[in-house]
Amino acid sequence: MYVRIVQDLIRELGKLPGIGPKSAQRITFFILQNPSFDIDRLSETLQSVRKQVQFCKVCGNFSEEDECVICSDPRRDRGVICVVEEPKDVVAIEKTREFSGLYHVLGGAISPIDGVGPDDLNIRQLLQRLADGTITEVVLATDPNMEGEATASYIARVISAMRIRVSKLASGLPVGSDLEYADEITLGRALEGRQYIN
């Protein structure tokens, strides 16, 4: 149907999340039919991202430095940490402009079916951050699905003895969805109306 190299490109693009065979084919045809599209720049940018972006040593968010721009910003409220599953959740919450504290990225959620337990997440690092006594509140902003709820419950239970207020996003987020798909207004209201667990 297509020459081998075109099939290879479609197959490789199709490995990206959210890109099915039709989208991969459309992107491939766009690249082939638009000689003004700077494919070299795209390639260089992809390679630069792979080489230069790392995880923040403090919170686990994406960063070009050892500390991300949020952790190194002196204007952030250092008494509140919002716990999220993935860096994309940080982006979603930042878009609301409702949260001015720090973040902690777990790197996923507890999922026994997928073989992911608490030790596979950045929970130990969270507990180390909480141990210094400067944090007064932890906002649990995990996805409103079974794995997210299990993760939030586990973290709330583990830190319950630390005398730190624990809150959870208010309802209003669709159950079973991901934070990244929530609109800014809904997510902002969920932050504003967060419910305290302890």
From Swiss-Prot:
SMART domains named in the record: TOPRIM
Record keywords: DNA damage, DNA recombination, DNA repair, Metal-binding, Zinc, Zinc-finger
Any one biological process term the GO annotation gives: DNA recombination
Domain annotation Toprim: ranges: 79-174
Gene3D superfamilies: 3.30.60.80, 3.40.1360.10, 6.10.250.240, RecR Domain 1
One Gene Ontology term of the molecular function aspect: DNA binding
Keyword Signal annotated: no
Domain of life: Bacteria
Family: Belongs to the RecR family.
HAMAP family for the chain: RecR
Name this polypeptide is given: Recombination protein RecR
Gene: recR
